[in-house]
Amino acid sequence: MKNTKLIVKTKSKTYPIYFGNNILNKTGWLIKKNLPNVKKICIISDNKLPKLLLKKLIKSLKKYELKIYKLSASERTKSFKVANKIIEQLLNDNFNKSDCVIAMGGGVLGDLSAFISNLTKRGLKFINIPTTLLAQADASIGGKTGINSSQGKNLIGTYYQPDFILSDVSILKSLPQREIISGYGEILKHSIILDRKFFLWLFKNGKKIINEKNNIFLKKAIIKSCKIKCKVVNKDEKEKNLRMILNFGHTFAHGFEGAKNFSKKLNHGEAVLLGMMIASELSNKKKKLSLKDLLLIKKHYLNLKLPMFITKTFKKNEVKKIIYFMKKDKKNIDEKINLILLNKIGKTTLPKEFSLKSDEIRNFLNSYFL
């Protein structure tokens, strides 16, 4: 499989994303090429990754002074306590602004590592090596850093772009089916909001991605997904306007995750898939999305057995908790819950165009349990 490079151009930084098969062992060479002044490297790695992956990375970095942390990739890890502990140790080890933090894991460790990089001495170098489909296709791009609060997900954070991203597609072969489905949710989101042609390609080839983990189709879907997100981020790095459309399905998703206490009962990608289905049905109810397009989306969900029924995951008495976390969402305006809805496959409503009172959303969610 041919290696590919995509350039991200934001106002604050221009940086490359490297895609390929078995390219993890090129990390050291890429650091030398892109960041020649690095001497010390802190690796923050998912403790459940195959040991061989970390060994490969360490072997490629043998010329550098290494500090290694293996962390649990749970939402509870994204905390001030964990971030502060690592920052204090980096300061104790005299990490300088020219030194580097590498995240090796999914979106959770990417968010946390970028947060740590940004706050330590007002900015260390940062490299992201995403090891999940969700992170390769979405979470690693865009510069959002974050930790969680008891009030909700990612309510504390900054924007801090990486110096480069390395996406080794061959790593995804080891992922369980649930993780592939989770990542597919973000790929599908990018097609639904901005690219009908890509959606129709996924409609035709989704099973090759999810069931077969076909390397060629996986790479094509990841790169296309990244190109769509990059196009948006390049225009609106700090989510002042256009970038908000990337939150399609996410306001519901954050409510769903919160209602399950951000536990592994419902992971982020599953919550996004469920949130997109609810947002699509609400779009149809509000006469934004045609029944024809809604049925096409539903057919794709059914074909791939994607999470789509709120009643299979929640009970009616959990709706109140869902609304509580939706009201905490960063995108809300005044007392209303701001939503991105669909006009058609490939086009959303405008950011800040559509907001509803929490009572109306509560009634809409309750209607599923009648």
Report residues per predicted region.
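ATP/NTP phosphate-donor binding region
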Residues: 1-100
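A glycine/threonine-rich phosphate-anchoring loop and its flanking beta-alpha core
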Residues: 9, 18, 115-207
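C-terminal charged capping/lid subdomain of soluble metabolic enzymes
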Residues: 14, 288-370
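Glycine-rich beta-strand-to-loop/alpha-helix junction loops that act as flexible
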Residues: 73-74, 104-106, 248-249
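Nucleotide-activated sugar donor-binding and catalytic core shared by glycosyltransferases
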Residues: 93, 160-162, 184, 292-295, ...
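Short glycine/serine/threonine-rich phosphate/pyrophosphate-binding segments
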Residues: 108-115, 136, 255
